[in-house]
């Protein structure tokens, strides 16, 4: 993004879409606690803030003095900024009383029941409604800046993965490989890992979330590597499974079953299909090959400012309809207890009938190191 004016234009478009949803809820304002959501609407990346957005598009950002200069540099456009000097709920209540609002939506997932009751007691003349996933609904459809930033996060992650492969050898620990990968994210221009890097070798490959441990990698093992770097707030999420030397025939067999299942899932990732359509395209193939019981998780999820976003084909029953410029993962897997596992995951952009794989890393042949 080349200028503050271009950024402001994008932010105003996001605000307009969000205020439309506020009005559809017949509300006057939305109180936002989720860091990803207030960043989406302000460009402020600090971790301590709350945002009030009115149906008219007015914004009130509440933070503290530590972030005063950062807010000034990061947030273009008109916005009231309040440096908190008291309890956050009291501060929010005070600002709401100054606005011409009656019905207020509150992000229910990010406020405790005690805080919600305190807010209602502080503003007895206002009507509060717990609301979930309103800004997330807007975030589902990525704009130009988001796609550019997301692609950069993916490219950094992919390059870092390529650079750790020569380090994988018998006797090296999973933890050492994971630490090096996390280091490379930053050296290649990223902001560090967006989740705890998974390096799961041998029997630990059957653990869907086998984060890097002290286990030493041995010859004849599969290694599941699930990784992603942040870049300017956006995250990649990629998985590759590699082999250290030759592995037993069934482990090699399930690699190619998972690969075909993923290809079928990606092919189904088109506008108009549901999450269930994508999940079933991959899951049914794994079932046909006799491994259905060893694929226990959903086939994917949305990605963006968070590694798991609202747009999610994750569950076999998901009815969410895919739309252009949604970014999702497609990640089938087979996990054989005490023997090993395979997962292959790519980041995919919904583009009409032509899903675009954003994470360009080889996978058509099992990589043997």
Language-model-detected regions and their locations in the chain:
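Active-site neighborhoods and metal-handling regions in enzymes and metal-associated proteins
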Residues: 1-369
């Amino acid at each position: 993004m080349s200028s503050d004016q271009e950024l402001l234009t994008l932010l105003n478009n996001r605000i307009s879409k969000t205020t439309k949803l506020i009005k559809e809820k017949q509300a006057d304002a939305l109180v936002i606690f989720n860091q990803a959501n207030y960043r989406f609407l302000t460009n402020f990346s600090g971790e301590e803030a709350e945002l009030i957005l009115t149906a008219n598009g007015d914004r009130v950002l509440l933070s503290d003095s530590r972030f005063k200069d950062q807010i000034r540099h990061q947030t273009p456009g008109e916005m009231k900024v309040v440096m908190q000097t008291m309890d956050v709920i009291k501060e929010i209540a005070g600002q709401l009383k100054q606005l011409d609002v009656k019905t207020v939506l509150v992000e229910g997932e990010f406020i405790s029941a005690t805080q919600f009751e305190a807010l209602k007691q502080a503003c007895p003349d206002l009507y509060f409604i717990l609301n979930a996933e309103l800004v997330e609904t807007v975030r589902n459809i990525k704009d130009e800046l988001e796609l550019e930033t997301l692609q950069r996060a993916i490219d950094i992650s992919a390059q870092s993965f390529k650079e750790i492969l020569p380090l994988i050898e018998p006797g090296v620990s999973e933890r050492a490989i994971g630490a090096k990968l996390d280091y490379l994210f930053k050296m290649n221009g990223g902001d560090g890992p967006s989740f705890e890097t998974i390096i799961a070798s041998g029997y630990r490959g059957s653990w869907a979330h086998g984060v890097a441990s002290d286990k030493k990698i041995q010859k004849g093992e599969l290694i599941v590597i699930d990784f992603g770097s942040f870049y300017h707030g956006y995250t990649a999420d990629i998985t590759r499974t590699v082999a250290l030397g030759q592995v037993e025939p069934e482990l090699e067999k399930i690699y190619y079953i998972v690969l075909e299942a993923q290809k079928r899932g990606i092919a189904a990732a088109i506008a108009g299909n549901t999450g269930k359509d994508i999940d079933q395209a991959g899951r049914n193939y794994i079932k046909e090959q006799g491994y259905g019981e060893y694929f226990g998780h959903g086939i994917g999820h949305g990605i963006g400012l968070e590694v798991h976003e609202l747009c999610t084909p994750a569950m076999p029953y998901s009815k969410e309809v895919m739309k252009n410029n949604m970014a999702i993962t497609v990640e089938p897997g087979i996990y054989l207890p005490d023997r090993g596992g395979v997962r292959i995951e790519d980041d995919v952009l919904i583009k009409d009938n032509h899903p675009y794989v954003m994470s360009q890393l080889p996978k058509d042949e099992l990589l043997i190191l």
